């Protein structure tokens, strides 16, 4: 099985559509998540150190600062979209800070990511989505080329500077790989964590006993986050391309076929999880498959865990009476990602 699900799809598109998507493919085919060894191994080795638990734990004070700042902007007893006002900006600002990207670029980062997502995971099949994906990839790549020029003139200690040093000193990645990796880290560094935080709050509102349990016992954050990851995974499936004919459970698989491994189905397997359809924030053990397995295990798993373990208790401690808003939640139109486009809530009173 190969993770490169983009190339076979791209090759089957009409010539005009392929022309539109040429710049998108220029960068996305270089993303670690779509590459096989040895290219995958080389790129992963370059960025692994920045995402080891010891390095990630060093960002705890900054994550706490960003979380507190966002919570301070929320008005008690108001009705708002929690995605727009909290669960999206939090992980976006964290990864932007890690990469040395100015906070005033938040709107652009979100816009570019949304455009690229239309190609990576949207269920839509329209010409507009391809043009938007092209625009998002071009504008994000141009932004990072400017950032790279600035870092070369004045290097820092941020993640982008470390990638540039690896590129310039050892020539272990091309200039396009440098830009593509920066794009991936920024894109993946906030999209799935936004989904995790949003669906966690939704799950708690729909399971009030667990909500009240979490408010009473915020020390359960560790097991609670693992349960949110299992109960409604932020990426609902992994896609692979068949490289050689074989069978899985008696099902013949032919070269070039796409295989969707549905994570959320595995995470509700009654043979592995007692009362699998129930939300239990103290569930332990909890060997879910949300972060994947093997060489493609999620690079940002520790960062996502840390952000959620900090943000959710801080949110519920500040606003212990969050309830559904008047409007219904709006889900993302996506094949792979599982998250909310908007989550209307009523905050209730504040403890601060």
Range-by-range predicted roles:
Residues 1-352:
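Cytochrome P450
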């Amino acid at each position: 099985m190969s993770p490169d699900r983009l190339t076979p799809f791209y090759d089957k598109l009409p010539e005009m559509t392929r022309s539109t998507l040429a710049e998108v493919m220029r960068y996305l085919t270089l993303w670690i998540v779509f590459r096989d060894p040895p290219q995958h191994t080389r790129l992963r080795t370059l960025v692994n150190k920045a995402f080891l638990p010891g390095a990630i734990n060093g960002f705890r004070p900054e994550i706490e600062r960003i979380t507190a700042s966002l919570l301070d902007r929320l008005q008690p007893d108001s009705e708002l979209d929690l995605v727009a006002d909290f669960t999206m900006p939090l992980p976006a600002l964290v990864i932007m800070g890690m990469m040395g990207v100015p906070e005033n670029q938040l709107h652009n980062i979100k816009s570019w990511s949304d455009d690229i997502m239309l190609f990576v995971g949207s269920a839509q099949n329209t010409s507009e989505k391809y043009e938007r994906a092209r625009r998002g990839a071009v504008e994000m790549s141009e932004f990072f080329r400017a950032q790279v020029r600035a870092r070369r003139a004045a290097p820092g200690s941020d993640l982008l500077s470390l990638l540039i040093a690896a590129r310039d000193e050892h020539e272990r990645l091309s200039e396009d790989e440098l830009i593509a990796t920066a794009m991936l880290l920024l894109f993946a560094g906030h999209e799935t964590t936004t989904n995790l935080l949003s669906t966690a709050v939704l799950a708690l509102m729909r399971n009030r006993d667990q909500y009240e349990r979490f408010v009473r016992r915020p020390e359960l954050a560790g097991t609670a986050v693992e349960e949110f990851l299992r109960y409604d995974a932020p990426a609902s499936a992994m896609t692979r391309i068949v490289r050689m004919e074989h069978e899985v459970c008696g099902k013949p698989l032919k070269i070039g076929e796409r295989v969707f491994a549905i994570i959320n189905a595995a995470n509700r397997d009654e043979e592995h999880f007692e009362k699998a359809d129930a939300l239990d924030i103290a569930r332990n053990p909890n060997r879910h498959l949300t972060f994947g397995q093997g060489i493609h295990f999620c690079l940002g798993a520790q960062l996502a865990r840390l952000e959620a373990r900090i943000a959710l208790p801080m949110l519920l401690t500040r606003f212990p009476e969050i309830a559904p808003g008047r409007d219904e939640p709006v889900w993302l139109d996506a094949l792979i990602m599982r998250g909310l486009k908007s989550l209307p809530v009523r905050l209730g009173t504040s403890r601060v």
